[in-house]
Swiss-Prot record:
Its cofactor is Mg(2+). It catalyses: (2R)-2-phosphoglycerate = phosphoenolpyruvate + H2O. Belongs to the enolase family. It comes from Mus musculus (Mouse). Brain (at protein level). The alpha/alpha homodimer is expressed in embryo and in most adult tissues. The alpha/beta heterodimer and the beta/beta homodimer are found in striated muscle, and the alpha/gamma heterodimer and the gamma/gamma homodimer in neurons. In striated muscle, the fiber-type order of ENO3 expression is IIB > IIX > IIA > I. The keyword Thylakoid does not apply. Mg(2+) is required for catalysis and for stabilizing the dimer. This is Beta-enolase. Signal peptide: none annotated.
Length: 434
């Protein structure tokens, strides 16, 4: 089925920054997709095109990307008469038309917006749910509902506190269904709010970009202690484990790490990667930490490799791998991590996202699908995670509608699958393992 019309506009994301939305029309109707954007971005990500006009949205407008769709990409696709079910052909055509390594001509935000809309239209054309269409594109006969990783305490670049590490997450792996995982997550979240309020006062329960709390604490183990207390208070010590996103590239200074990077710089307090690794091992020993993302800088390969060889938990590459097949291949070869964080806007098309996921999975890695801190009401990644069978998703706390949009969509998908629904649970690292 051919595309009839492609129209892009500038909308606002959950942080009040402009982003790209695309409407694609076929005989089956209108299909709409919106593109997310990140706060802590890896230097190897595909280029998000911003206008740079300081007099408008502080330089963050996306009118150029919108114009690239309306004037160039859209007309070229309509002229080419490609079918919306041919996701790979459509994406390949756009990437070749752009012609740059990092999509800097049109912007990854322009190409991805069209790619997402095409995927939704393709599902409608086939008369199947989006998650089923994505599973077909990936060659997956099965569907798996993921364990949600709720980011409930925020630090790093996501929060105005002194906490260096960016995210502290709870994963209800002991739940029997996605719906139960949501309930457990929400209950722990409310208990955590009570614990923080009692210890730090009411204003400590304001929420960050992703719906988590950002109490003004400095010590990272204090955040873990708060989680442990809340999990106990909610009554789920046997069902909930902890994940972290350190985003260490944000506090990497001249080969060392600064765990107090929001204070005036003092090289005397910087620590080595090895020392930081010892701190993580301490966390793993004292708390139910099962996953650590970006524990070291995106170019500190040697430290990643030596750390991975000494632990048996999940080590996730985000800034390290940026959903990019070349970086993933490098990380596989160096044995730097064992899980890929999959962000569609880091690579900039549906086809390349699926390829990155399959590359990681074929090397025995886990894959965690992820939102960005600047999100929209778009729910594409909920269907993506089910179709790709990755078994884990992080899309914020159970708070703020742009986060709940994804979680609620996952509950609907589970409901639609009925007794065929499979929840990853404790097998979240490798849900396809029999």
């Amino acid at each position: 089925m051919a595309m009839q019309k492609i129209f892009a506009r500038e909308i606002l994301d959950s942080r009040g920054n402009p982003t790209v939305e695309v409407d694609l029309h076929t005989a089956k109707g209108r299909f709409r997709a919106a593109v997310p954007s990140g706060a802590s971005t890896g230097i190897y990500e595909a280029l998000e095109l911003r206008d740079g006009d300081k007099a408008r949205y502080l330089g963050k407008g996306v009118l150029k990307a919108v114009e690239h769709i309306n004037k160039t990409l859209g007309p070229a696709l309509l002229e080419k008469k490609l079918s919306v079910v041919d996701q790979e052909k459509v994406d390949k055509f756009m990437i070749e038309l752009d012609g740059t390594e990092n999509k800097s001509k049109f912007g990854a935000n322009a190409i991805l917006g069209v790619s997402l809309a095409v995927c939704k239209a393709g599902a409608a054309e086939k008369g199947v749910p989006l998650y089923r269409h994505i599973a077909d594109l990936a060659g997956n006969p099965d569907l798996v509902l993921p364990v949600p990783a709720f980011n409930v305490i925020n630090g790093g670049s996501h929060a105005g506190n002194k906490l260096a590490m960016q995210e502290f997450m709870i994963l209800p792996v002991g739940a029997s269904s996605f719906k139960e995982a949501m309930r457990i997550g929400a209950e722990v979240y409310h208990h955590l709010k009570g614990v923080i309020k009692a210890k730090y006062g009411k204003d400590a329960t304001n929420v960050g970009d992703e719906g988590g709390f950002a109490p003004n604490i400095l010590e990272n183990n204090e955040a873990l202690e708060l989680l442990k207390t809340a999990i106990q208070a909610a009554g789920y010590p046997d069902k909930v484990v902890i994940g972290m996103d350190v985003a260490a590239s944000e506090f990497y200074r001249n080969g060392k790490y600064d765990l107090d990077f929001k204070s005036p710089d003092d090289p005397a307090r910087h620590i080595s990667g090895e020392k930081l690794g010892e701190l993580y091992k301490n966390f793993i020993q004292n708390y139910p930490v099962v996953s650590i993302e970006d524990p070291f800088d995106q170019d500190d390969w040697a430290t990643w490799t030596s750390f991975l060889s000494g632990v048996d938990i999940q080590i996730v590459g985000d800034d390290l791998t940026v959903t990019n097949p070349k970086r993933i291949a490098q990380a596989v070869e160096k044995k730097a991590c064992n899980c890929l964080l999959l962000k569609v806007n880091q690579i900039g098309s549906v086809t390349e996202s699926i390829q990155a996921c399959k590359l990681a999975q074929s090397n025995g890695w886990g894959v965690m699908v992820s939102h960005r801190s600047g999100e929209t009401e778009d729910t594409f990644i909920a269907d993506l995670v089910v179709g790709l069978c990755t078994g884990q998703i992080k899309t914020g706390a159970p708070c703020r509608s742009e986060r709940l949009a994804k979680y609620n969509q996952l509950m609907r998908i589970e409901e639609a699958l009925g007794d065929k629904a499979v929840f990853a649970g404790r097998k979240f690292r490798n849900p396809k393992a029999k």
